[in-house]
A protein has these predicted regions:
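Conserved N-terminal entry element of GNAT/NAT acetyltransferase domains
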Residues: 1-8, 142, 147-155
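Acetyl-CoA-dependent GNAT
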Residues: 2-66, 79
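Short hydrophobic/aromatic beta-strand or adjacent loop that forms the aromatic wall/cage
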Residues: 33, 138-143
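Short hydrophobic clusters on alpha-helical segments that form packing/core surfaces
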Residues: 60, 82-86, 104
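A short, internal acetyl-CoA/4′-phosphopantetheine-binding micro-motif in the GNAT/acyltransferase core
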Residues: 63-71, 99
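Conserved acetyl-CoA-binding loop-helix of GNAT-fold acetyltransferases
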Residues: 71-84, 110
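Conserved GNAT acetyl-CoA-binding A-motif
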Residues: 86-99
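Conserved catalytic-core motifs of GNAT/GCN5-like acyltransferases
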Residues: 95-97, 109, 114-137
């Protein structure tokens, strides 16, 4: 598995839609963002889009792994690569938003992210179709953050 930084416009839309089902929202955060990919035999099997949202703060807008490649450590490897790259760019804090239940709760906690806010009704307001997971509609967004240590970037 190879991890690379790449133009976010070259990341497969179908893969980004795995994490964010609103193509219009994806199109809105791609310009000016950083793109990262996990490559297997030169095929993008994991993708991440992050962007600057404050002086030393970045947000991970999207991170996804192809469904047939999940549960193989690709997402965790990609996330580590992204965090290292953001630290090298001088980013001191990384934020992201997730649903309020599901696998992402433990996933991001394992990587050190902590909940710092709840945005009530976010998915009801910003998505035209209900977002469902395990038969339950996601309504609220959990805002999570991680402080990057200056030494997270490996030489």
């Amino acid at each position: 598995m190879t991890f690379v930084e790449m133009n976010p416009a070259h990341l497969p839309l179908a893969l980004l839609l795995e994490a964010d089902p609103a193509a219009s929202r994806i199109a809105a955060y791609l310009p000016g963002a950083w793109g990262f990919a996990a490559l297997a035999d030169n095929e993008v099997v994991g993708a991440c889009v992050a962007g600057l949202v404050g002086e030393q703060t970045a947000e991970i807008f999207n991170i996804a792994v192809a469904p047939n490649r999940q549960q193989q450590g690709i997402g965790s490897g990609l996330l580590r690569f992204v965090l290292e790259n953001l630290a090298e760019k001088g980013i001191g804090r990384v934020e992201l938003g997730t649903g309020s239940f599901g696998h992402q709760l433990t996933y991001y906690q394992r990587h050190g992210f902590r909940v710092h806010a709840v945005v009530k009704d976010h998915f009801l307001i910003h998505y035209p179709e209900p977002l469902m997971e395990h038969g339950i509609q996601d309504k609220d967004m959990l805002r999570r953050s991680l402080a990057l240590a200056p030494d997270i970037a490996t030489p």
